[in-house]
């Protein structure tokens, strides 16, 4: 089993580059199934295990997928007749596999998709996806662990109001509606930058989508879509993690590819704490020194504070003075990393959906295990400043969302190694 071992205490300095966004590339790869004319080539694709998983799903659906890791590119040719079924073998590994349902319904009028797997954070229900497909005219039923969808009369544009701004449901409905007859309105839509990237990609393919990044998205269905070349946006969560790495070590680093507008809620909190940020055209420079000020954070759908940055921000807050409260409103069960932080001598108490952090914790190196993708990064961040050695296991979580994080931190001056036991 792999582990990452960190000896804390080094300030990070230098420059580091952000990869393409995991949460953008997965839906965009599935959207490539919509192109019945010409293959699509995606560039700035991160070399992640989740990308390999979704590529395997696309292959089972009869798409030809060529993964050019050395170029950070994937070519998807979905011009042949697609298979209707995404089997449990692959879908069970990752929740994003549910995103093939929208494109399959759009292209074939029917689909069978196994109920998904992925991170064990909360229930992450798929009711909003199903509600959207039914509104577009599909009949849905669940049987033997599979979702069966059939639109025998084709998908027809409609108005859909989401109960909450679900990112996955917004993406799935956009993809299904892009080839539906007529106009579809999605109200209370998710507004994440990854939604905008998906809409831009489909528009480049010949789609007619407006309003992405706002509460209301309009999709005018078209007859067909064609393959194009598209560059994936930088990963705002990786960028945020690296900014915090600079701040937590009281270092000075330049994060190339970090985009302020994609992470405004995070950078404003960092500035509130006394972290110095210099916004440049091609990235953000982060500098910090001395004591940081206490702030409270509350996770919310975009443009609020991202739940995917909650555990990393908690690591930074452990190094700040005063009383801090972290409130999680997006997912239940997203404080599983607290028990691991406590093994490192963190002073945290969880009360319901809030975690209370008292004073500056004198973090100590310990053996800890990652409980999910972002917790893995947060424990590594804590290890950068802990006294002594920290060993982080369960790195399969980390590999789902970060490319060579330990290598990037080492390049910036961290004393860190990945060891295969």
Swiss-Prot record:
UniProt keyword annotations, A-Z: Cell cycle, Cell division, Cell shape, Cell wall biogenesis/degradation, Cytoplasm, Peptidoglycan synthesis, Pyruvate, Transferase
GO CC annotation terms, alphabetical: cytoplasm
Domain of life from the UniProt record: Bacteria
Main EC class the enzyme belongs to: transferase
Binding site for phosphoenolpyruvate: 22-23
EC number(s) given by UniProt: 2.5.1.7
GO process annotations (BP): cell division; cell wall organization; peptidoglycan biosynthetic process; regulation of cell shape; UDP-N-acetylgalactosamine biosynthetic process
Entry binding sites for UDP-N-acetyl-alpha-D-glucosamine: 95, 124-128, 308, 330
Cited function: Cell wall formation. Adds enolpyruvyl to UDP-N-acetylglucosamine.
Family of the protein in this entry: Belongs to the EPSP synthase family. MurA subfamily.
Name listed for the protein in its UniProt record: UDP-N-acetylglucosamine 1-carboxyvinyltransferase 1
Lineage: Bacteria, Bacillati, Bacillota, Bacilli, Bacillales
């Amino acid at each position: 089993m792999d582990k990452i071992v960190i000896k804390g205490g080094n300030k990070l300095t230098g420059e580091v580059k952000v990869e393409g966004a995991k949460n953008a590339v997965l839906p965009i790869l599935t959207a490539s199934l919509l192109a019945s004319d010409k293959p699509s080539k995606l560039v700035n694709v991160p070399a992640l295990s989740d990308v390999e998983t979704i590529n395997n799903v696309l292959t089972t659906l009869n798409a030809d997928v060529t993964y050019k890791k050395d170029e950070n590119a994937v070519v998807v040719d979905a011009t042949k007749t697609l298979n209707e079924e995404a089997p449990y073998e692959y879908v069970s590994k990752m929740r994003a596999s549910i995103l093939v349902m929208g494109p399959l319904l759009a292209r074939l009028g029917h689909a069978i998709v196994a109920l998904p797997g992925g991170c064990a954070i909360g229930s992450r229900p798929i009711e909003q996806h199903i509600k959207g497909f039914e509104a577009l005219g599909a009949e849905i039923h669940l049987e033997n662990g599979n979702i069966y969808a059939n639109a025998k009369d084709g998908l027809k544009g409609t108005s859909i109001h989401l109960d909450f701004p679900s990112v996955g449901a917004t993406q799935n409905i956009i993809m299904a509606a892009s080839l539906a007859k007529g106009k579809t309105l999605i109200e209370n839509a998710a507004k994440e930058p990854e939604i905008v990237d998906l809409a831009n990609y489909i528009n480049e393919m010949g789609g007619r989508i407006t309003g992405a990044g706002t509460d209301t998205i309009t999709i005018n269905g078209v007859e067909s879509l064609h393959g194009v070349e598209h560059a994936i946006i930088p990963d705002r969560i990786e960028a945020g993690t690296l900014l915090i790495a600079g701040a937590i070590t009281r270092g000075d680093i330049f994060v190339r590819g970090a985009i302020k507008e994609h992470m405004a809620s995070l950078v404003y909190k960092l500035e509130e704490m006394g972290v110095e940020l210099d916004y440049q055209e091609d990235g953000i420079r982060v500098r910090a020194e001395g004591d940081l000020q206490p702030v409270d954070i509350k996770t919310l759908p975009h443009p609020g504070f991202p739940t995917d940055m909650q555990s990393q921000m908690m690591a930074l807050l452990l190094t700040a003075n005063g009383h801090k409260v972290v409130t999680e409103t997006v997912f239940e069960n997203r404080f599983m990393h607290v028990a691991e932080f406590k093994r490192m001598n963190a002073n945290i108490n969880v009360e319901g959906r809030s975690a209370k952090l008292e004073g500056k914790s004198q973090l100590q190196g310990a053996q800890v295990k990652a409980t999910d993708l972002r917790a893995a990064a947060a424990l590594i961040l804590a290890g950068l400043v802990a006294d002594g050695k920290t060993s982080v296991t369960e790195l399969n979580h980390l590999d789902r969302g970060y490319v060579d994080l330990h290598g990037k931190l080492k390049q910036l001056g961290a004393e860190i190694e990945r060891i295969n036991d």
